[in-house]
Amino acid sequence: MALLVLVILFCLPIFLLFLLQKHRKNTRAKLPPGPPGLPLIGNLHQLDATNLAFCFWKLSKQYGPIFSLRLGFRPTIVISSAKLAKEAFKTHDLQFSSRPALSGTQKLSYNFLGLTLTPHYNSWREMKKKFVTHILSANRTEQFRQVQTEEIFRMIEKRFEDEGTAAVSRLHSVFAETQAMVGRVFFRDCLPFVGCWLDSLTGWNRRLRNNFSDCDKVYQQLIEDHLDPKRPKVAEQEDLIDVLLTEMKIADDHQTFDSIKSTIMENIAAMDTIKVTLEWAMTNLMKNPEAMKKVQKEVRYVVKDKGFVDEDDLPRLEYLKAVVKETLRFQPAAQFLPRETTERCVIDGYHIPAKTTVFVNVLAIGRDGQVWDKPDEFIPERFVGSNIDMGGQNFEFIPFGAGRRICTGLPIAMPIVELALANLLYKLDWTMPHGMEIDDLDYDANPGFTQHKKNPLRLAATKFI
């Protein structure tokens, strides 16, 4: 009898969910086309979790630039064209201003206390005001600019030192795991009742808890280091954590250590996208020797024998900027933009209900043969003399998003990428390590929200200047 009761208790919620799902299917308005799914799990079995963007891209070739999926009980649409991205982010920007509340992002952002991942538009708007006031102000930007320049020079010098310490390796593995957690849709995000059990059974709950614990220890140590009374206080060398701690002391809002940790997490993720972009840029240049020769010639001609590249040189480095843009088109750091509709709207004649998860496939848009000539080739020249930028107005090229939720740190991130790449190309000559050929370089990527190279780039560098 006890066993029978357990079976009934387990099966009853599943049966009720099946009836609810069937009712929704019969009463829904005209949705975009999409692959047929199975009861309860929908299309979950058809997705390749190791590379969602390519999986979505493949489905778009069969079902069109907008198609529907059902991830368990989570209604989902995928947009894969510049035209429909513009319709979503410009015509219906307010309706697409939220983000899906996923388990990984919720846990690792301390219940959405940071700016980037919060699904709540009003909270995001208030946090953005503070970010612009305290981080993007002219004085702060100039302070951070000096620190960034010093760090870039230090990074280049460390190429010739032994930095393969256990501590560095440990931090790298922790934050690589964070990217995997942030980019994952957990079972409990899609399947009420049984999803949490499945996450426990498959070990994803344990991985998320362990990663959160590892990250929290890192953030806590950073905060304690900044609170140490013996730490030198130099106003010109204040960093982001100093600014956040100062604001927590003087502000009358609810700034807490957890909110500071959430901001640290998001900024580490932002720095990670910069590192990823640099790695892909160098990969592309090594695979395309003529482009490498051309960009190094430009940088060294403009900078001459000054000894370093600074931000004042960047406006004259047109081909270098084209290399960065082409890299972001070819391998966008974030392959898709997650959104959630705040209310019902119509896209391309299809009805999109409120609370629908939306993935805008940046990778597919950047490889669209109807927009780009030879989209599968790395051709920086396509951006030379072009007015296309990444500020969210050219919807065929939106590596940092568009609309209200465009990446707030874009004005900081791009100069860092360009400055770092320019100095790497100016100061160093690059070759393949002994025993390796250029053909050994691949474009394989790890699963996760950010497109990390599966096989880290290994190059030999010799000092040019």
Predicted regions, residues:
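Terminal signal-anchor or tail-anchor transmembrane helices
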Residues: M1-N26, P415
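C-terminal helix/juxtamembrane-tail motif
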Residues: A2-L4, F10-F15, T246, T357, ...
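Cytochrome P450 substrate-recognition site 1
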Residues: T27-V147, E151, A167-V194, F449
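Conserved cytochrome P450 K-helix E-x-x-R motif and the immediately C-terminal K′/meander segment
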Residues: L44-W57, K61-G64, K217, D310-Y350, ...
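Cytochrome P450 heme-thiolate monooxygenase catalytic core
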Residues: P100-T105, E142-L278, K294
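Cytochrome P450 heme-binding "Cys pocket" and the immediately downstream C-terminal segment
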Residues: P289-A291, L410-F449
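Conserved cytochrome P450 K-helix/beta-meander segment immediately N-terminal to the heme-binding cysteine loop
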Residues: V360-I388
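Cytochrome P450 heme-thiolate "Cys pocket" and heme-binding signature region
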Residues: S386-V417, D444-P447
